[in-house]
Amino acid sequence: MSRFIIRCLVDICALCPTERQLKHSITPTLKHMTYELSYWERESFFKSIDVAVIGSGIVGLAAAIHLKKLDPNLQVAVLERGTLPVGASTRNAGFSCFGSMTELLDDLQQASEDQVLGVVEKRWAGLQRLRALVGDENLDFQMLGGYEMFTEVEESVFRQCLDRMPEFNEKIGRITGWKEGYKVVDDRLANFGFKGIKHLIINQPEGQVNTGKMMSALLARAQEAGVRIFNGFALKSVEDSSQGVELHTAFGWSIRVPRALVCVNGFARQLMQMPEVQPARNQVLITQPVPGLRVEGCFHYDRGYFYFRNLDGRILLGGGRNLDLETEYTDQFGSNERIREALVQLLENVICPGQSIPIDTWWTGIMGLGPVKKPIIERVSPNVTVAVRLSGMGVAIGTLVGQEGAEMCMGYEI
């Protein structure tokens, strides 16, 4: 009897596919899979859509919620290609920042003062709209300040910031209501424990949010408003005509809607052939919990190309695009070992010197940049509106951009 049982088990194992075989047999390559849309699917899910919002990031969800506020009877659907928003909304660092001094000084070399202050004003207004829409508790919003770090070789840049600080505090203060937003806080360096940092400037009204909680709350708000959300809805192209907007999917079928609002940010060049939107990838890591971590707040290093913050007793650290700009101008996710090595070196030599900090996980996010930092909110054809190019400031400006995009889509003046 025992030999019979053993023989049966051997036969069963021989028939069972290996894990490798299972991976190949049950995981279809969706981007190559084509099929027809059934009558039931077309009539029940896609026939009555009034506005299709493409992209379920901060901009797309804020737009969808605002559309329902403008007209509660409007049938709004959000179409998202990923299981979760694919891009930057769930992959950023959660900084509620609106402008460090060096960034604004650099911007003043490229644009007028009115233009630079206009961008800051939109970022600040966007943050207030996000907080009002989601709520500070749901955001896990903490106004811990945003810090800019200066090394010894950046002494001249620091002095330039110091000279302009009274002027910046006056002009930015008119926007934020803070009389002394920017402040030198070198006395905090010892507590943070950084190595090789000579000066710190804090922007006091800046803070941080929990990106995951933020997006969960936005999804809940959208669904409560009656917005339908379709994940796995991969689009190949958007085609406008007198009959409406034809949305061609990667699965071989299409649907037609009266209006479309495109909120895909870094993927606008790919989907909408918009060369004025440059996709840019950022590498991000989060450490394992760091015993005795003293870092608290959001920090910018090397003109803001590197950034880090505390999160759940860990360090979240990202950036470094300036080390390999051409490679990182891409809308493809993936690692860059040169940049990842630099991030680890920054972590172990500057942020937590003398410690070997285990990395929990890595990921990448895709931003949408351009020659100017003003977002693109415009009607590109009679029935198609775009709200893209957040310039790495999606948390700050995304809600405002989405709401203004919704209003333009419906014919309001913005």
Ranges and model annotations:
Residues 231-244:
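A conserved short coil-to-beta-strand element within the FAD-binding core of flavoproteins
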Residues 249-295:
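Central helical "cap/lid" subdomain
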Residues 356-414:
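C-terminal catalytic lobe of FAD-dependent flavoproteins
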Residues 71-91:
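Glycine-rich FAD pyrophosphate-binding loop
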Residues 293-374, 378-380:
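Active-site lid/adjacent beta-loop-alpha segment flanking the redox-cofactor pocket in flavoenzymes
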Residues 102-108, 132-144, 148-216, 225:
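Flavin (FAD/FMN) cofactor-binding and adjacent substrate-gating region
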Residues 5-13, 20-51, 69:
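Extreme N-terminal leader/targeting segments of oxidoreductases
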Residues 66, 84-142, 157-160:
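Conserved FAD-binding subdomain of flavin-dependent enzymes
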